[in-house]
Amino acid sequence: MKQPPLAAFFGALLAEPRKIGAIVPSGGRLARLMTSEIEPTAGKVLELGPGTGVFTAALLKRGLPARDLTLVELETRFIAPLQQRFPNVTVLQRDARELASCRAELGSQVAIVSGLPFRNMPIEVITAIVGGGFSLLERGGAFYQFTYGQSCSVPSDVLGELGLRAERLGRVRLNLPPASVFRISRIEE
Ligand SMILES: C[S@@+](CC[C@H](N)C(=O)[O-])C[C@H]1O[C@@H](n2cnc3c(N)ncnc32)[C@H](O)[C@@H]1O
């Protein structure tokens, strides 16, 4: 049976608020900023925590071929709606903590777009996800993350341990709540 994406969102929010970490899906302005640096012909892109698919739709709208996009979503309620809405995109029901062991399956990526609620996660989990993500990213690849806070939601200790830096791309005041987007990249590049 088809379930509308918003019904899936509010069902998941009521059942597991810390896993969702947002009161509503991201808005179009935030989706455009999150995807603004992604060159549609550059290669494969991984999206973590797509939820209802707001960033997925923005990536496809930029011209990214559906075959170059893989979604990693843990919450069961979002899987069927994502598959129905984006039939040519690969949707994996997977914990983003497992990324480090997915290299053979996923191959190398040019960018990672993440809607994960890092502020609700322990530091070891953030380290595993971001470290695993960078094990998949090509040289020059970037990890895009939004946050409702002022600073990057990947703690500076984790960035330092992994040899990464975070730069703010911008802030979207007209999002509910207002949100900032950070580009995380390797320091040596
Ligand atoms: C804040 S919502 C963002 C949804 C969407 N990207 C947006 O911006 O509207 C967080 C998403 O991350 C997913 N998520 C949380 N922990 C996860 C994990 N360990 N692995 C994969 N997805 C996870 C949740 O199920 C949810 O879809």
Describe each PLM feature range.
Residues 42-51:
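Conserved class I S-adenosyl-L-methionine
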Residues 127-139:
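A short glycine-rich, Lys/Arg-flanked "PGG" loop and its adjoining helix->strand segment in the class I
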Residues 1-40:
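S-adenosyl-L-methionine
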Residues 137-148:
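Conserved beta-strand signature within the Rossmann-like core of class I S-adenosyl-L-methionine
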Residues 82-83:
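Conserved SAM-binding loop
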Residues 75:
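Conserved SAM/SAH-binding beta-strand->alpha-helix loop
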Residues 53-57:
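Glycine-rich SAM-binding Motif I of class I
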Residues 171-189:
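Core SAM-dependent methyltransferase catalytic element
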